[in-house]
A protein has these predicted regions:
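N-terminal Rossmann-like NAD(P) cofactor-binding module of classical short-chain dehydrogenase/reductase
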Residues: 1
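Beta/alpha (TIM)-barrel catalytic core signal, keyed to glycine-rich beta->alpha loops juxtaposed to Asp/Glu
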Residues: 4-145
Length: 145
C-alpha cells in the first residue's frame, strides 16, 4: 500500500502491480489518495487499487471519494473512524441520543453508520474492553429516524 501520493508514486505503484502480477501480493492499494490523486492512479494503473484508506468519519464522510471509488470497484477504508476523538466526538449529543436508543455507545453508532454506508473501518484502541465494544456492532441497524 502506498501511504501518501508523494514522490514517484506512479513508479511505486507500477512496482506493486508487478508484485501483484507475480503472485507476491494478493491485493494492492493506496492510502490518503483523495479523488484527484485517486483518479490519476486509477487511469494510470493496469491493476486498479483494491482499497483506498482515507480519513473517514461522521464529520468527514468522504461522499465524493466514495462515489469515485465505487465507480472503480475500489473499497474505501476509514483509518480514523472516531475523528481521533477531536471536536468532543464522544460527547456529541445526537450520537449519544442515537446510542441510547439502541443501547450502544457513541463509538458503536459511529462504526455502524460507516459500515452501513459501505466503509471498512479500522478503529484504534489499546484497551481490550473497547476492542470488544468495537466488534459488537453487528447486532443492530441504524434507521432513518
Amino acid at each position: 500500500m502506498i501511504h501518501q501520493p508523494f514522490g514517484d508514486y506512479y513508479g511505486t505503484y507500477r512496482a506493486m502491480e508487478e508484485a501483484y502480477k507475480a503472485g507476491k501480493a494478493r491485493a494492492i492499494g493506496v492510502s490518503n489518495f483523495y479523488p484527484d490523486r485517486y483518479i490519476d492512479i486509477a487511469h494510470f494503473a493496469e491493476v486498479v487499487p483494491a482499497v483506498n484508506q482515507v480519513e473517514t468519519h461522521l464529520f468527514q464522510q468522504q461522499k465524493v471519494a466514495r462515489e469515485y471509488l465505487a465507480k472503480h470497484n475500489t473499497q474505501i477504508m476509514s483509518w480514523r473512524p472516531f475523528a481521533e476523538g477531536k471536536n468532543d466526538f464522544f460527547n456529541t449529543p445526537v450520537l449519544k441520543e442515537i446510542g441510547a436508543k439502541y443501547g450502544k455507545s457513541v463509538a458503536q453508532v459511529a462504526l455502524r453508520f460507516l459500515l452501513q454506508n459501505g466503509v471498512v473501518v479500522i478503529p484504534k484502541s489499546t484497551h481490550e474492553e473497547r476492542m470488544q465494544e468495537n466488534f459488537n456492532v453487528f447486532d443492530f441497524v441504524l434507521t432513518e429516524d
